[in-house]
Amino acid sequence: MKRTYQPSKLVRKRRHGFRARMATVGGRKVIAARRARGRKRLSA
């Protein structure tokens, strides 16, 4: 059986990166919530 996590920096950036988040309303809310919480890293 193949493992579920097959790391790829490119896929990680495209799916969960800052620009991917900013592209949708929901994603912008995620960034805002993480800023409000004081997260050191906002996105992948």
UniProtKB/Swiss-Prot annotation:
UniProt key word rRNA processing: no
One molecular function GO term is:
structural constituent of ribosome
A single Pfam family, by name? Ribosomal_L34
GO cellular component entries: ribonucleoprotein complex; ribosome
Q: Which InterPro entries match?
A: Ribosomal_bL34 (IPR000271), Ribosomal_bL34_CS (IPR020939)
Q: Which UniProt keywords apply?
A: Ribonucleoprotein, Ribosomal protein
GO BP term, example: translation
| Coiled coil ranges | none
Q: Which HAMAP family match?
A: Ribosomal_bL34 (MF_00391)
Which family does the record claim for this protein?
Belongs to the bacterial ribosomal protein bL34 family.
Protein's recorded name: Large ribosomal subunit protein bL34
- The organism encoding this protein is Methylobacterium sp. (strain 4-46)
